[in-house]
A protein has these predicted regions:
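Periodic aromatic/glycine/histidine/acidic cluster detector
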Residues: 1-134, 139-157, 163-231
């Protein structure tokens, strides 16, 4: 038997128009059980579960029109298992796998058309293994390999027409030999198609972060630290 202070309590908050904004349950001031947040139009924004203040089990977030935005699973308040995000048109955006909160295994990023944009491999949260990026026309944009989050082996970047743009070899993150760059001003390397993001080694990290920028409602839909303290 729970004492009065140990009973699970339901809390519902409303927006200025009287629509339900958030429905949650707490036990001893910590989130416990089902949690649901809503858009102003009544559609569910996110639906997940808590145990002792931490996220636990399956979780789903949605766009305002009801389309699924993200699907994931949590264990001990950390992402664990498959994570899939979607564009508003319903196409998959990202497919990832987590182990105890860290990326592990293959990461795949797609264009809105459903074509593959990027494939990477992770181990214990670090880049480890081959990776490859594509232009929208299907041409390889860049490829290489990482070992323990450091470049290792051959790196090649291409123009959209398939000609080599950059080429280099790395060992344990350090350049070995010359870094070769082939000028776009060479008529053979020009392409009259629409411009896309440049592919250079210097831009690579920013491109990777941009490609993975998903509005992760699972991380930002509430201040969980405050919730756990019962504020």
């Amino acid at each position: 038997m729970f004492s009065a202070k140990e009973k699970i309590e339901e809390e519902v908050t409303y927006d200025e128009k009287g629509q339900v904004k958030e429905r949650k349950f707490t036990l001893k001031g910590k989130l416990e059980g089902e949690y649901t947040s809503y858009y102003g139009n009544g559609q569910i924004m996110a639906h997940l579960y808590f145990r002792n203040g931490g996220r636990e089990g399956d979780a789903v977030s949605y766009y305002r029109d009801g389309q699924i935005r993200e699907k994931a699973a949590f264990r001990n308040d950390k992402l664990d298992g498959d994570y899939v995000s979607y564009y508003e048109n319903g196409q998959q955006r990202e497919i990832e796998h987590y182990n105890d909160g860290k990326l592990d295994g293959r990461y795949t990023l797609f264009f809105t058309t459903g074509q593959t944009r990027e494939i990477e491999n992770f181990k214990d949260g670090k880049l480890d293994g081959d990776y490859i990026c594509y232009y929208k026309n299907g041409q390889v944009k860049e490829k290489g390999r990482f070992v323990n989050d450091k470049r290792d082996g051959e790196y090649i970047a291409y123009y959209k027409n398939g000609r080599i743009r950059e080429k280099a070899t790395f060992k344990n993150g350090k350049l070995e030999g010359k870094f070769l760059s082939f000028d776009i001003d060479d008529p053979a390397n020009r392409d009259n198609g629409p411009e896309e993001e440049p592919t250079t080694l210097a831009d690579e990290d920013n491109l990777r972060e941009t490609g993975k920028m998903v509005d992760d409602l699972f991380r930002n839909l509430a201040n969980f630290e405050k919730e756990q303290k019962g504020k």
